[in-house]
Design a protein with these regions (language model features):
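Active-site neighborhood of HAD-like aspartate-dependent phosphohydrolases
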Residues: 1-40, 69, 176
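Conserved Lys-Pro-Asp/Glu-containing loop-to-beta segment of HAD-superfamily phosphomonoesterases
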Residues: 6, 140-168
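Alpha-helical substrate-recognition element adjacent to the catalytic core
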Residues: 25-28, 32-65
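Metal-dependent phosphoesterase signature
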Residues: 48-92
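Surface-exposed amphipathic alpha-helices with a cationic face
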Residues: 92-100, 151, 171, 175
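Generic structural signal for small/hydrophobic residues in well-ordered secondary structure
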Residues: 10-13, 51, 98, 107, ...
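Substrate-recognition/cap helix-loop segment adjacent to the acidic, metal-dependent catalytic center
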Residues: 89-136
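Short, acidic loop-to-helix structural element flanking the phosphoryl-transfer center
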Residues: 6, 75-106, 144
Length: 183
């Protein structure tokens, strides 16, 4: 019998690797262009995750930060980056095993609305009993409100839930509310 009824997963760097260099490399050819793109597309990523920045406005602003020859690269990045997170197969296997053993599984992840709209690109998403992405609800980890939103929306008890995230501050926030976790 499982100790926890619910296992909550972050997406980036838990379910799939979010490797900036790998992803950016899909949208440009030179190290110099990669660095130009990085500074342009990630300048307000935290606000995109929080849902406090408009995605299309961010694209337009990012274009002002790079030479004109990279404008199409910026647009292409913002429209397609979600396709280049690399699945972490061990975690996908764990998710399926947990489901087979009767656990409920959830996603709690900071992510732009664009990713929330395209997360089903990853077939593993179909396995989840519930999903909370930050931007659509204008909340983000590690603020307690997003954890409460998860608990309330899916009627979860924190003490019956276990959280897997790649950031210590997110685990600590869950623990402060009674949900055990692992980095």
């Amino acid at each position: 019998m499982l100790k926890y009824k619910n296992v909550v997963f972050d997406f980036g760097n838990v379910i799939a690797t979010f490797d900036e260099d790998y992803i950016l490399g899909k949208f440009c050819d030179s190290p110099e262009d990669l660095e130009l793109l990085r500074s342009a597309v990630f300048y307000n990523w935290a606000q995109l995750d929080e849902g406090t920045a408009d995605y299309d406005t961010s694209i337009q602003h990012a274009k002002t930060l790079v030479p004109e020859r990279l404008h199409d690269n910026v647009t292409d990045f913002f429209r397609n980056w979600h396709k280049y997170l690399q699945p972490i197969e061990e975690i996908w296997s764990l998710i399926r095993k947990l489901k087979e053993n009767g656990a409920s599984v959830y996603i709690l992840s900071n992510a732009p609305t664009h990713f929330a709209d395209h997360a089903d690109f990853y077939e593993i998403v179909q396995e989840f009993d519930g999903i909370v992405f930050s931007a659509p609800i204008v909340m983000a980890k590690p603020k307690p409100e997003i954890y409460h939103h998860l608990f309330d929306t899916y009627h979860l008890k924190p003490e019956d839930s276990f959280f897997i995230d790649d950031k210590p501050e997110n685990i600590a926030a869950g623990q402060a509310l009674g949900m055990d976790g692992y980095i």
